[in-house]
């Protein structure tokens, strides 16, 4: 069983979008996938409910409930945890202890980047992170590669002690897919294949570290 925690202290960074598409990827691969929704908005749960009829359904579990771990089926192969919005390192201890890797989405603006620093500093106090026994990867999200702002943001992220493991472009495709309970991995159109390619570095990193 592999567990991936998706966390960010900054609201609107794309945490749930990253979580749902990641869960869909593993489900499309044929793996028994659970999405632990620890965000009080429960947008990830609603996404799971919309695809419950599919062969690639993802089982939602309420991560805000007491003893939520007991609801994880024994045949689960992959767990994706959508962390609570605005949570700092100390608030994530229960999820961090389960995680095999952590993904942190960051938007391409100095305000968002600066807001992420205290979060990463708080996570660094965790014993597993401090001892480098828990891999942490940054994901540049909603990037517009043709703009100076996005290019500068990526360069700034690369100067941090954590690896930039992926760069996801700004596109309405994610908004449309989430509304349908789908992901960019559920279709084989040429347009969506280009978005799938954006995920290759993230998936390669996860395969390497867990």
At which residue positions do the language-model features occur?
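Conserved GTP-binding G-domain of TRAFAC-class P-loop NTPases and closely related GTPase folds
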Residues: 144-210
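Conserved catalytic-core segment of NTP-binding enzymes
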Residues: 84-166, 170
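P-loop/Walker-type NTP enzyme "switch/lid" segment
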Residues: 3-9, 13, 20-97, 178-185
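Residue-level recognition of oxygen-bearing side chains
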Residues: 18, 118, 173
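Surface-exposed, flexible loop/turn segments at secondary-structure boundaries
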Residues: 11-12, 41, 110, 144, ...
């Amino acid at each position: 069983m592999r567990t991936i925690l998706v966390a960010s202290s900054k609201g609107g960074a794309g945490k749930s979008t990253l979580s749902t598409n990641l869960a869909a990827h593993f489900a499309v691969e044929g793996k028994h996938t659970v999405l632990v929704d620890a965000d009080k908005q429960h947008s990830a749960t609603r996404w799971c409910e919309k695809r419950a009829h599919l062969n690639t359904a993802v089982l939602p579990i309420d991560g805000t409930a007491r003893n939520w771990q007991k609801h994880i089926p024994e045949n689960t192969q992959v767990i994706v945890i959508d962390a609570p919005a605005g949570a700092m390192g100390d608030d994530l201890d229960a999820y961090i202890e389960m995680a095999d890797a952590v993904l942190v989405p960051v938007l391409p603006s100095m305000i968002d980047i600066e807001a992420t620093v205290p979060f990463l500093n708080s996570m660094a106090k965790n014993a597993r992170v401090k001892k480098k026994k828990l891999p942490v990867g940054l994901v540049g999200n909603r990037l517009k590669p043709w703009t100076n702002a996005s290019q500068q943001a990526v360069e700034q992220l690369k100067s941090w002690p954590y690896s930039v493991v992926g760069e996801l472009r700004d596109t309405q495709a994610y908004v449309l897919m989430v509304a349908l309970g789908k992901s960019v991995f559920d279709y084989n159109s040429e347009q969506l294949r280009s978005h799938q390619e954006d995920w290759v570095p993230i998936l390669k990193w996860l395969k390497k570290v867990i």
